A protein has these predicted regions:
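A glycine/threonine-rich phosphate-anchoring loop and its flanking beta-alpha core
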Residues: 50-144
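Nucleotide-activated sugar donor-binding and catalytic core shared by glycosyltransferases
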Residues: 33, 96-98, 109, 229, ...
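Active-site segments that bind and position negatively charged phosphate/pyrophosphate groups
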Residues: 141-250
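Residue-level signal for inorganic ion chemistry
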Residues: 65, 104, 183, 210, ...
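A short, small-residue-rich loop immediately preceding and capping a beta-strand
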Residues: 28-51, 55-66
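ATP/NTP phosphate-donor binding region
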Residues: 1-35
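Glycine-rich beta-strand-to-loop/alpha-helix junction loops that act as flexible
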Residues: 7-9, 39-41, 169, 181-182
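C-terminal charged capping/lid subdomain of soluble metabolic enzymes
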Residues: 1, 121-123, 225-303
Length: 303
């Protein structure tokens, strides 16, 4: 057994990080009959699992995620890699198939509450893609999750895995994009805030993306306004407050549209029409502009 200590940026691994992993696999004579084990956050587990999948046709990989968001996601999705700092689009990804994922919930109970909030935001978005009954179960157990109760945490992880697997295995191609809900808004805000975005926690950017896109969904696909407010309430229950900032609507709208085409040629967003029904939906310019103006005005008032 050989140990490799890999320092990966929480923002995401690069191909340079992958090259280090490949070098270690080669130096240690790892073959497809061996086992690669990754211990770390989402970015670390993602790059190691990606490398193991390429090595010798495919080498089995086991993951031991150490953060709550990683426990919820690494079995089904990986954090995309970037080619280099000069090509910073995080677009190198595949569906991970680790042979084993082991979650130590003591790490969740002992963690700083601030370090759990990205996991909470991911959990809210994931549960929106599940059924109405599962969403209701989830919202009722938020206090127990926050208290670190074992049964509630086990249920949260299990519900997340089931919901994410169902999305990836959906027969409707449109439904397979459900896990991207909120991410267009997240990327838009990150770009528009510029250097200031580095001071904003990742969970807050993702949460703002979900808040904004939930409002778009109300107009674009008749998403019940009560559920829009439930999303807001759930995020606030997890201690994720609204973010205060001042942006020009025209610049925000232009960047939002640009982000839609970064990963796809379709001008459509994964939006919830109902609980458990997040589908690709076309958003009219008038709807986007109206909601963007209202959203940005509300955030400016927080300053």
């Amino acid at each position: 057994m050989s140990l490799l200590v890999l320092e990966v940026s929480p923002a995401g691994a690069t191909l340079a990080d992958a090259d280090i992993v490949f070098g270690a696999l080669s130096a240690n004579g790892i073959t497809c009959d061996d086992l690669v084990v990754a211990v770390g956050d989402t970015a670390t587990c993602s790059v190691v699992c990606w490398c193991a999948n390429q090595w010798c046709g495919r080498t089995e990989c086991a993951l031991l995620p150490t953060t709550f968001d990683a426990m919820l996601t690494v079995a089904t999705t990986m954090k995309p890699l970037v080619a280099s700092s000069a090509h910073a689009l995080p677009a190198i990804a595949f569906r991970p198939e680790p042979g084993l994922v082991v979650c130590d919930l003591d790490l969740v109970r002992e963690a700083d509450p601030e370090d759990l909030k990205l996991g909470y935001a991911v959990l809210v978005g994931t549960m929106l893609s599940s059924s109405k009954s599962r969403w209701n179960q989830f919202t009722e157990t938020v206090p127990e999750i926050l208290a670190g109760e074992e049964v509630a945490l086990v249920n949260a992880v299990q519900w997340s895995q089931t919901a994410r697997k169902d999305v990836l295995m959906a027969t409707n191609p449109s439904a397979r994009h459900a896990l991207d809900f909120g991410k267009t808004g997240e990327r838009t805000l990150r770009v528009c805030l510029g250097d200031a975005a580095s001071q904003v926690p990742a969970y807050q950017l993702l949460s703002e993306g979900m808040r904004f896109e939930a409002r778009l969904a109300h107009d674009a696909c008749d998403f019940d306004i009560d559920y829009v407010f439930e999303v807001d309430d759930c995020l606030e229950d997890f201690g994720i407050e609204e973010l205060a900032f001042d942006l020009e609507p025209a610049a925000y709208i232009e960047e939002f549209r640009r982000q839609q085409f970064v990963r796809s040629n379709r001008s459509m967003l994964p939006l919830p029409a109902a609980l458990g029904a997040i589908r690709l939906t076309s958003v009219e310019d008038e709807v986007l502009e109206r909601h963007a103006h209202a959203y940005l005005a509300s955030r400016k008032e927080l300053l």
